């Protein structure tokens, strides 16, 4: 069987790969595994460094955002604290004014009568002084009541009413004008004290 054609070899893909591997080994000799290990180590280091750089960059972005959020929150809290301090100062000044006015009214109400003092503080509004005109007592707050006493006697009567009430109760008396009779009365909502002046 003589054939003029060249023989056909049937080699598989695996056989070709094996042949290539053998040829590489013969060319490179024993250096091939060391070179492969060295390249592997270099790539592994580069991957670790790249991953660390990316992670650090992400952390830095997150930290800067967190710092900015904290800075904004702190500035808002400082504004709130300043506002609360202003409100507290206003409240304290209001309380001090109210307390001073109350003290002044109490001093006027409980003042010892002397010959020169003819003024009596209005028991209803406790701000203005009463005026005596033709048997009636008038205040600028709008009240008017009739009483047979003069200014000094009325002041003594008011002080006696307050003192007798304070023996039984710690609350302040309320004075009012009864519309039908036009007389001055006092009462306490706490102890049910009620009396005419």
Swiss-Prot record:
Give the boundaries of each RIP-type zinc finger: 122-191
Task: Give the span(s) annotated as Disordered.
Answer: 1-20
Key word Disulfide bond present in the record?
A: no
Q: Which UniProt keywords apply?
A: Metal-binding, Zinc, Zinc-finger
Gene Ontology terms, cellular component aspect? nucleus
* Presence of keyword Transit peptide: no
* GO biological-process terms attached to the record: protein import into nucleus
Official protein name in the record:
RIP-like protein
Species: Drosophila melanogaster (Fruit fly)
The taxonomic lineage of its organism, from the top, reads: Eukaryota, Metazoa, Ecdysozoa, Arthropoda, Hexapoda
């Amino acid at each position: 069987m003589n054939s003029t054609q060249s023989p056909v070899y049937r080699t598989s893909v695996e056989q070709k790969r094996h042949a290539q591997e053998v040829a590489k080994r013969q060319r490179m000799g024993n250096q091939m595994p060391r070179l492969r290990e060295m390249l592997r180590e270099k790539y592994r280091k580069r991957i670790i460094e790249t991953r660390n750089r990316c992670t650090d960059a992400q952390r830095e972005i997150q930290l800067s955002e967190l710092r900015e959020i904290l800075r904004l929150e702190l500035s808002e809290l400082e504004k709130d604290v300043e506002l609360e301090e202003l409100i507290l100062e206003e409240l304290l000044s209001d309380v001090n004014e109210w307390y001073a006015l109350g003290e002044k009214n109490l001093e006027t109400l409980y003042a010892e009568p002397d010959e020169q003092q003819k003024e009596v503080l209005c028991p209803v509004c406790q701000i203005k002084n009463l005026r005596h005109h033709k048997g009636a007592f008038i205040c600028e707050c709008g009240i008017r009541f009739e009483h047979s006493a003069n200014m000094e006697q009325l002041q003594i009567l008011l002080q006696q009413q307050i003192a007798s009430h304070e023996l039984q109760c710690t609350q302040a008396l309320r004075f009012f004008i009864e519309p039908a009779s036009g007389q001055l009365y006092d009462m306490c909502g706490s102890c049910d004290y009620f009396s005419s002046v």
